[in-house]
Swiss-Prot record:
GO terms for biological process: negative regulation of NF-kappaB transcription factor activity; peptidyl-lysine monomethylation; regulation of inflammatory response. Keywords: Methyltransferase, Nucleus, S-adenosyl-L-methionine, Transferase. It comes from the Eukaryota. Its EC number is 2.1.1.-. This is N-lysine methyltransferase setd6.
Amino acid sequence: MGPDAKKQKLQSEDHLQNDLPVSCFLAWCKKVGLELNPKVYISTEGTVSQYGMLAREDLSDGELLFSIPRSAILSQNTTRIRDLIEKEQDSLQSCSGWVPLLISLLYEATDSSSHWAPYFGLWPELDPPDMPMFWSEEEQTKLLQGTGILEAVHKDLKNIEKEYNSIVLPFIRRNPEKFCPMKHTLDLYKRLVAFVMAYSFQEPQEEDEEEDIEKDILPPMMVPVADLLNHVAQHNAHLEFTPECLRMITTKSVCAGQELFNTYGQMANWQLLHMYGFAEPHPQNCNETADIQMVTVREAAFQVARTEEDRLEMQKRWDFLCHIEIVGEEGAFVFGLEEVMTEEELKACLKVLCMSTDEFAEYKENDGWEEDEDNDEQTLLTQEISRLPIPWRKLLHLSAELTLKAYKTELSMDEALVNDPTAYAKLSSREQHSLQVQYGQKKILHLLLELTKS
């Protein structure tokens, strides 16, 4: 980065530090013992999205960016209504497991006297990231068809409304001294769900606790400052958890003027857009994936079947695969750039759908158990798909073709836009992010077509 660019960044830093919400937040950080390295600063300029953190000076690998005492974290255990939440914990059980935190946010975010008021002051209107759940239905369909995001958003909205009406609203009505249905509305709840989805952290399980993971799942929590760092797959910072505090540490050297990036995990672009409202430009996301819905493979098998009797046989095999929980109506086979993430399920499905009648009878008699000739521990690399048995490849090829038909545009059209800076710049941010999602998915699906062609 040249000196002019660095000077511009430092000027934007000075401008932001004079911004009232940010200056109030930074003052609060000092008050609660949140220690920020003087070599970094918070900004909305020069970042990939909204707030971010940039380096004022060069940083070395392993350098502490900031530390956050656990008392500054906002969770169901630190909110002022923690006793009430604990008292009503049985009635706050939900599939998401987020209700206690969301109720804490409903209370703290709407009270100007809250300990975390300066933190919420960074988002004066509590406006969430520009996630697809807040787009119009027309825009959702236009930009997201075929990506899997559309179905995920519809499921989210249905679950949010159900959770609010069946759990949260009754809680609000039982506690009128602290809550009000006119103030703590479904719309506000939806926005706070987006905040939790985009900004919350979940403490990882200790290794010796893995066996009890279903029993002792730790609830999400809001971590000031840490949630301001943006994400890229090739990140340069990492959040560490200690008994006393949380610490953000650099994982590589960072030059002055560069942005600090945390990681949200190994996330494909469709997941990033769905949960965080952005996507990484191709080819920067090394975690990109494409899904083929399991029911699409079933549809391909039906199309391959020559007679009605063959189709009935395929249905029997599909039903059996569902019975032994290899496939499901809402499941998907996931293909990455380097490997197949659902190798075991994919191989079992293709094998059963393509085996002879006698082989299936024996397989069914053994309830799906058989002596594996393959090494179960060996990962199926994407490039190795070309070595699968011919009938398997034909079925997978047709499944990829059917998946591609669900999109509104062809890969060539997406490629032309991505490679034309002028045309790409004219797109809205929503259009750009959606394009990156579709382009990455279609590239992988076309790779599958190439690897499975006869």
